[in-house]
Swiss-Prot record:
InterPro entries: Dynein_IC, WD40/YVTN_repeat-like_dom_sf, WD40_repeat_dom_sf, WD40_rpt. It is found in: Cytoplasm. The gene is DNAI3. Its main location: cytoplasm. GO terms for cellular component: axonemal dynein complex; cytoplasm; inner dynein arm. Residues 1-27 are annotated as: Disordered. Interacts with ACTR2; this interaction reduces binding of the Arp2/3 complex to the VCA domain of nucleation promoting factors. Part of the multisubunit axonemal dynein complex formed at least of two heavy chains and a number of intermediate and light chains. Found in a associated with the catalytic heavy chain DNAH2, the intermediate chain DNAI4, and the light chain DYNLT1. This is Dynein axonemal intermediate chain 3. Signal peptide: none annotated. The keyword Coiled coil applies.
Length: 891
């Protein structure tokens, strides 16, 4: 820095420039055309803002957008920097200004074209600091003055409002009043498919070969006058009539009233009267209560106004659609790829990571496996400042289908491959590089993002490839694609039996993954204690040279990493297992709220220059304190659309003595397809959203009779979903046709509040992100590899005054409804049992007869049998009836 100061001083000696001689300078540009000749726009660079202590959002804010600058400081800056000074265009105005301080104003909305403007007159400065009061007559007169300056506002789509014009158009439109006759002519079914031969034939040679349509006069069109449009209106005659009573005899008269007062004697007697004393004693308590209420609460407040929401908010309430802010596409990839997972960087605002995979089926992957080995599988880091070039590229042995940033250290990333391996990256060496990206700085420096035309992408930028630190063992890990991965919280850790212990290290050291091979695995990134000690010679033989660009953070895990414990969800009596696709732990809602905590931890880690992951101790110790009241149950979504609530703790099998996974606590088959999303609400610990197949469901952890909400079948299959981060009753659902359904439970609970088209193909992932209290974004990835960044409107990002209480009341009401349905089901089953018992009793009563009745019935049956036998024998001629007696003679 010292040589630069010498150069500046040498310049000052060689070419001194008098400041007061400003006749040769060009005239400064003012805003006389806009009616403000005292205003001179300026462009102040960051260096000039630091010199004059007028930095945006630090020295100059929205509450105080101006600063008084000493005239001598401007002259000093002109002497030091000459024509390079930002005040050089207004040098003449500064010289002619009579006062000692000039008013510099920050033009946030670029009303006058630049980011600052200078007020060149004392009168203008006084009018800005102390604006004159405008009378009501002048304000009414201003409404009729046409404005010469028009600010262009882009058109915004608004919902159509009916004003009745469509009814007039329908009345004037011509519609057919008569019903049309339709003829359908077809061949016989026996002649279908018969060969057809066409030939020439004379129409006159065959009888009835043709039908002649001769012309004849139509009587329907012989009317001379058809119709006439005639309009008539009856209007009564109007007369103006007025009456006025005349004041014939005017007189001036005045009237005055005065109150009747007690005399002194009456006052004394009234004070001593018992009724007055009793009244004062009884009324004094009520008066004291009323006075206390007046002191405690404001009795003049208007409760009706407080029912509505505040109007002085950011954004347009009528705008309910997502607006596309930016999009990212990997233009340098030679193959067609899709985005499988999206994650915003927890601490660096404006940085987002996506994993991409080749769009091939299983058979095509096997066929083109040789070519796919030559192409790297990547996780791309995109920044808002450069939509073309990725900031970082994380390499992996195969395509990544899910990944997560470590909650304790955002520079540690874990991902799951399609081949069943877990990959670990450490980007600590590149943290400073991605933190200093243009447009992606910390949240404290800026409150809003810059538009794209103000950002300058870096030219001739080379892609930064980062190799992985460690890969899990192929033999001991998953056998198929890893569909979901989660970090366990830094407050606990588990052992091989699933028991929960206190985590004394204070960092996240364990992972949980689920795969399509019907297993759920828990992993520990710390080095495990070897069963047998190894000699130093053997260690030297097994040592492998590490490339210089690969950190040694997780070198102890590379190709030898095994799961701590493995779970299989059996289907009960059968030998088959459930195939998990997504899981949701009880601690997931806590990890969603740790962005500020991670930011503070990253700052302290920088100050200490010590990464705790570089000195990891061995696995779970024996002296850790167990946590007894910890909930070890979690939700699992399967490939068949089942939602399972199970426990990761092991139990000992009484027959074999081995530790086996527990049976699922509950199982519901709600979805008719693969479960793509299981996510806990960021506002309620026990509310879970599941998305799969053609419908959506919302569950409560303590209610296992069924879902609180189950949507009907959608027009297209659902592929992803996510809760809103700021509104408890809003969640976003992606479909396979490129539409996104936005559900608002305050508005509708049976269907989406609105649907919006985002792309032309399937939506694969949805991730919202809070940039500032006034601005939110949502990242939507599609099947063609494009990442869409959309801005969330005000109505979908800002909750109402009582939204959380209303949604909580809705969930409680649905819980009561499920309990009522369950009670009615039990009552109905009991009623059915009672009805069956009554029917059985009636049947028993019918068949239980007395002995006399049974003998009488048997006697009647026997007599009927004898009669039948007699008739049969008579008909056969075997017997004859004599006239003398009633006996029978056998022939």
């Amino acid at each position: 820095m010292a040589p630069k100061q010498k150069k500046k001083s040498s310049r000052r000696k060689k070419s001194p420039k008098p400041i007061l001689a400003a006749s040769e300078d060009m005239e400064p540009v003012n805003m006389e055309s806009m009616g403000h000749p005292e205003i001179y726009p300026l462009v102040l660079t960051t260096k000039t803002q630091e010199i004059f202590n007028c930095r945006i959002d630090e020295d100059i804010t929205d509450e105080q957008p101006y600063k008084l600058i000493n005239k001598e400081d401007i002259f000093e800056d002109l002497r030091n920097r000459a024509a390079v000074s930002d005040f050089h265009p207004v040098k003449k105005i500064v010289q002619e200004y009579p006062g000692n301080e000039l008013l510099l104003v920050y033009d946030k909305d670029f009303k006058y074209g630049l980011n600052f403007y200078l007020i060149g007159t004392e009168e203008g400065e006084e009018n800005y600091l102390n604006p004159p009061e405008v009378s009501e007559e002048q304000e009414e007169y201003k409404e009729y003055i046409p404005e010469d300056v028009y600010i262009y506002k882009p058109p915004v789509s608004k919902p159509w409002v009916s004003l009745g014009s469509e009814k007039e158009i329908e009345e004037e439109s011509v519609t057919e009043s008569t019903k049309q006759i339709t003829y359908m002519i077809s061949r016989k079914r026996s002649e279908f498919g018969a060969p057809i031969k066409f030939s020439d034939q004379n129409a006159s040679s065959v009888k009835d070969a043709y039908i002649e349509c001769t012309a004849y006069p139509d009587k329907n069109f012989t009317l001379k006058q058809l119709e006439k449009d005639v309009g008539m209106q009856v209007i009564p005659q109007i007369k103006d009539i007025s009456t006025q009573t005349k004041w014939t005899y005017p007189k001036n008269a005045t009237t005055q009233y005065y109150p009747r007062e007690f005399s002194e004697e009456e006052k004394e007697t009234l004070k001593q009267s018992k009724p007055l004393v009793d009244f004062l004693n009884n009324a004094s308590i009520s008066v004291e209560i009323a006075l206390q209420q007046n002191e405690i609460t404001n009795t003049f407040i208007d409760d009706w106004k407080h029912l509505a929401e505040e109007e002085g908010t950011f954004g347009d309430k009528t705008d309910t659609h997502l607006k596309e802010y930016q999009s990212f596409t990997d233009l340098h990839s030679p193959t067609e790829k899709m985005i499988t997972c999206v994650s915003w960087h927890p601490t660096i605002y404006g940085l987002i990571a996506v994993s991409v995979a080749v769009r091939l089926s299983f058979e095509d992957r096997v066929h083109f496996s040789g070519k796919l080995l030559l192409q790297p599988s990547l996780i791309l880091f995109w920044s808002f400042s450069d939509p073309i070039h990725p900031q970082l590229m994380l390499e992996s042995p195969d395509d990544i289908f899910c990944f997560k940033f470590c909650p304790s250290d955002p520079n540690i990333i874990a991902g799951g491959c399609i081949n069943g391996q877990i990959v670990m990256w450490d980007i600590t060496a590149h943290a400073d590089r991605i933190e200093n990206i243009k447009g992606g700085g910390s949240r404290s420096k800026k409150a809003t993002l810059k538009p794209m035309f103000l950002l300058e992408p870096e030219s001739n930028k080379e892609a930064m490839y980062i190799r992985h630190c460690a890969v899990s063992s192929i033999e001991n890990g998953h056998k198929r694609v890893i569909t979901d991965i989660h970090w366990l919280s830094d407050t606990f850790e588990i052992n091989r039996m699933g028991s929960v212990f206190e985590n004394r290290s204070g960092i996240c050291c364990q992972l949980v993954t689920c795969s399509a091979d019907c297993t759920i695995c828990f992993w520990d990134i710390r080095p495990q204690k070897p069963l047998t000690p190894q000699t130093t010679e053997k260690k030297k033989e097994e040592s492998i040279e590490i490339p210089f660009d690969v950190p040694s953070t997780f070198l102890h895990l590379d190709l030898s990493w095994k799961p701590l414990t493995k779970l299989k969800l059996s289907k009960g009596e059968t030998s088959l297992d459930h195939c998990p696709t997504k899981i949701s732990l009880n601690e997931d809602h806590l990890l969603c709220k740790t962005q500020d905590k991670m930011l503070a931890q990253s700052k302290t880690a920088k100050a200490e220059e010590m990464n705790p992951y570089h000195n990891l101790e061995s696995g779970v110790a024996n002296l850790l304190k167990p946590i007894d009241d910890f909930c070890t149950k979690f939700f699992v979504g399967t490939e068949e659309g089942e939602v399972i609530y199970t426990d990761w703790k092991m139990e000992r099998d009484p027959e074999t003595g081995r530790f086996m996974p527990k049976k699922p606590v509950n199982l519901h088959t709600i979805h008719d397809g693969i479960v793509h999303t299981i996510q806990r609400s960021p506002f309620y610990d026990d509310i879970i959203l599941t998305v799969g197949g053609w419908n959506v469901a919302i569950w409560k952890e303590s209610v296992m009779t069924g879902p609180l909400l189950q949507s009907c079948c959608a027009p297209k299959r659902y592929t992803s979903g996510h809760w809103s981060l700021t509104r408890p009753g809003v969640f976003y659902i992606g479909r396979e046709d490129g539409y996104i359904d936005i559900w608002d439970l305050l508005e509708k609970t049976h269907e989406p509040a609105q649907s919006q088209n985002i792309c032309i193909t399937m939506i694969t992932c949805i991730k919202p992100w809070i940039f500032s209290p006034k601005q939110q974004f949502i990242a939507i990835a599609d099947y063609y590899g494009t990442l869409h960044i959309l801005e969330i409107p005000w109505t979908l990002s800002h909750p109402s005054a009582n939204e959380m209480a209303s949604i909580n009341h809705y969930f409680e009401r649905e819980v009561k409804h499920l309990e009522y349905v369950e009670q009615r089901k039990k009552i109905r089953e009991q009623e059915k049992k009672e009805m069956e018992q009554e029917m059985a009793k009636k049947k028993v009563k019918i068949y239980q007869k007395s002995k006399e009745q049974m003998e009488a019935e048997l006697k009647m049956d026997y007599e009927s049998y004898l009669e039948l036998e007699k008739t049969v024998l008579i008909n056969l001629g075997l017997i004859k009836v004599t006239e003398k007696g009633s006996y029978l003679d056998v022939m």
